[in-house]
Amino acid sequence: MKNPRRLAIAALSGVILVGLVAATASARISSPAKQAASIKACVLLPDTVTSTRYTLFDAPYLKAAFKKAGVPALILNAHKDPQKQKSQAQQCLAQGAKVALFDQLDPASGASITDLLVAGGAKVIDYDRLVVGSKASYYVSFDNPTVGKLMAKGIIAAMKAKKIYGKHPVVSELNGDIKDNNAKQFKQGYDSVLNPLFKNGTFKKAASGDQWTDWDAIKGRRIFDQILARNGNKVNASIAANDGLAGAIISSLKAHGLKPIPVSGQDATPTGVQYILAGWQSGTVYKSVRKEANAAAAAAIAIVKGKKVPGVNGTVSGTKSIILTPVWVTKKNYKLLFKEGFLKRSQVCIGQYKKLCK
């Protein structure tokens, strides 16, 4: 049961003030003036709609890192509202933020908010998503083209295991949001593997089978229903750009009375791992949010303390970057998620899936 006192605080303050307030990252603030110049760092997270990772993982990991370093920080979530994210950026500046970890919602608002933060005297670290061509000082994320390559190689391995590789399988793609630079990089990655196979006839692309979904699983389900209809229910494998879209494909297959096909995923969600154990999903790309959050927090803390930013290992679109390596998770190595504390057995190995955990 949640602590009633914490709920009350969350309703009134709407912030996570590291070291000072234990509240959710998604509520509203009522009187920011009272906390003016009270923070050194700020985190602007994008939403709770397309992924639960921001509330379940990013916010608590970042909160812990800033608290350990003794750096007061404000963590906010825009709930997929660009205007709200802009207001939150203004709030961060009003409260004295010297550095902002910024995960944009879309390129247009992302560039505008970055300009706002920089003009207000804050250094910007693009977190997870890069605002291309912006004034950000650093970028922290995973190797996104490699994420896409892992997906493509994952479903290819599954097709070989099912002995349908070499039989001209029909393959579809459910992409993320065309406005999301990460989604475009994921697609760049899996297309670099799949397009040569489409071109030489090894695979056949499903009719109407390359669609953008806005990271919306409901829309993804509707689109995949249409893809099945256009292809006489004969789709042999599919890219799903995250576990939510994989779930949309799986629900569509079940509704049509069809058997499992190779399906990719991303984010290593409890449901995604359960589908992997049950044989409905081939795998999921695991990106250690803990490592990403800790790397980003370390960069922000270094800036606040006037020290050299650790871990810089490249440049992306002219921005100094800290790029991390993703992992493809299957039935063979899913326990890595438990070992690293990303998921708990109690989240996955329950109900009908308990007997599948070995």
Where are these regions (language model features)?
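Secretory targeting and sorting signals
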Residues: 2-28
